[in-house]
């Protein structure tokens, strides 16, 4: 546990006990309910300022954090990698020290996970991982919230991941341990989880299986999750598409899941590639609730980081 004078960072799900993650989600659920009832008059982060650092632009992350901070009574400013020359001019450590004198909390979206860790190590205010190449904990907190909103407690349930190995999958693996659900992973052999993630899974004791058969992974699952096959800037798109075609989430694959299974995707989706229109627009899809819950889950995270949530 962190000491009272240490900032409350949100860097990875593995860094925090389940009780703290649950406190954030409980706060998120309560704040969403109050917002829907027009009863969210409390502004627990009034007078607080969030600095949002983006290595590259992101519509969803920027809007959800900006709106979330405003709804909690605070304000935000956006800084881009181009503006800051992060790590190329002033060092990351010095940037962290300076920003800590100006703002109350920092959210950073940067591919280099080590840069996130260096920023957090030198900041005297909380730092939130908005996304790195290694993990995407804010997204998966929203996903857990969405599952429980639709299907009740996630503990003991089965989540199936089909497609590529990426940062969202890593955070799902971390969540499987923290929230005690089963995770079935199916990827092409050439795109299987990294050795580092495999080693972590083995040591974690989490109920996670890794395979190559999407039908086996999805069979009987309570939730099916996928993500885009080719991230922005990837140069081997055609090769990856050929490998991943058998992992498309379509009606046939969804029919193998539990009859009440839901479908999730963090968006943006490439329709006709990793998922068909029939599935993403169908009755089992909760992708837009999931997208909305980024806002609410991140409000819970912001409030926890700044001590407004126990």
Curated annotation (Swiss-Prot):
<keyword id="KW-0808">Transferase</keyword>
<dbReference type="InterPro" id="IPR002292">
    <property type="entry name" value="Orn/put_carbamltrans"/>
</dbReference>
<feature type="binding site">
    <location>
        <begin position="136"/>
        <end position="139"/>
    </location>
    <ligand>
        <name>carbamoyl phosphate</name>
    </ligand>
</feature>
<feature type="binding site">
    <location>
        <position position="85"/>
    </location>
    <ligand>
        <name>carbamoyl phosphate</name>
    </ligand>
</feature>
<feature type="binding site">
    <location>
        <begin position="58"/>
        <end position="61"/>
    </location>
    <ligand>
        <name>carbamoyl phosphate</name>
    </ligand>
</feature>
<feature type="binding site">
    <location>
        <begin position="231"/>
        <end position="232"/>
    </location>
    <ligand>
        <name>L-ornithine</name>
    </ligand>
</feature>
<feature type="binding site">
    <location>
        <position position="167"/>
    </location>
    <ligand>
        <name>L-ornithine</name>
    </ligand>
</feature>
<keyword id="KW-0055">Arginine biosynthesis</keyword>
<comment type="similarity">
    <text>Belongs to the aspartate/ornithine carbamoyltransferase superfamily. OTCase family.</text>
</comment>
<dbReference type="InterPro" id="IPR024904">
    <property type="entry name" value="OTCase_ArgI"/>
</dbReference>
<dbReference type="GO" id="GO:0019240">
    <property type="term" value="P:citrulline biosynthetic process"/>
</dbReference>
<dbReference type="GO" id="GO:0004585">
    <property type="term" value="F:ornithine carbamoyltransferase activity"/>
</dbReference>
<dbReference type="GO" id="GO:0042450">
    <property type="term" value="P:arginine biosynthetic process via ornithine"/>
</dbReference>
<dbReference type="GO" id="GO:0016597">
    <property type="term" value="F:amino acid binding"/>
</dbReference>
<keyword id="KW-0028">Amino-acid biosynthesis</keyword>
<comment type="pathway">
    <text>Amino-acid biosynthesis; L-arginine biosynthesis; L-arginine from L-ornithine and carbamoyl phosphate: step 1/3.</text>
</comment>
<feature type="binding site">
    <location>
        <begin position="266"/>
        <end position="267"/>
    </location>
    <ligand>
        <name>carbamoyl phosphate</name>
    </ligand>
</feature>
<feature type="binding site">
    <location>
        <position position="294"/>
    </location>
    <ligand>
        <name>carbamoyl phosphate</name>
    </ligand>
</feature>
<keyword id="KW-0963">Cytoplasm</keyword>
<dbReference type="InterPro" id="IPR006132">
    <property type="entry name" value="Asp/Orn_carbamoyltranf_P-bd"/>
</dbReference>
<dbReference type="InterPro" id="IPR036901">
    <property type="entry name" value="Asp/Orn_carbamoylTrfase_sf"/>
</dbReference>
<comment type="function">
    <text>Reversibly catalyzes the transfer of the carbamoyl group from carbamoyl phosphate (CP) to the N(epsilon) atom of ornithine (ORN) to produce L-citrulline.</text>
</comment>
<feature type="binding site">
    <location>
        <position position="109"/>
    </location>
    <ligand>
        <name>carbamoyl phosphate</name>
    </ligand>
</feature>
<dbReference type="InterPro" id="IPR006130">
    <property type="entry name" value="Asp/Orn_carbamoylTrfase"/>
</dbReference>
<feature type="binding site">
    <location>
        <position position="227"/>
    </location>
    <ligand>
        <name>L-ornithine</name>
    </ligand>
</feature>
<dbReference type="GO" id="GO:0005737">
    <property type="term" value="C:cytoplasm"/>
</dbReference>
<protein>
    <recommendedName>
        <fullName>Ornithine carbamoyltransferase</fullName>
        <ecNumber>2.1.3.3</ecNumber>
    </recommendedName>
</protein>
<dbReference type="Pfam" id="PF00185">
    <property type="entry name" value="OTCace"/>
</dbReference>
<dbReference type="GO" id="GO:0006526">
    <property type="term" value="P:L-arginine biosynthetic process"/>
</dbReference>
<dbReference type="InterPro" id="IPR006131">
    <property type="entry name" value="Asp_carbamoyltransf_Asp/Orn-bd"/>
</dbReference>
<dbReference type="Pfam" id="PF02729">
    <property type="entry name" value="OTCace_N"/>
</dbReference>
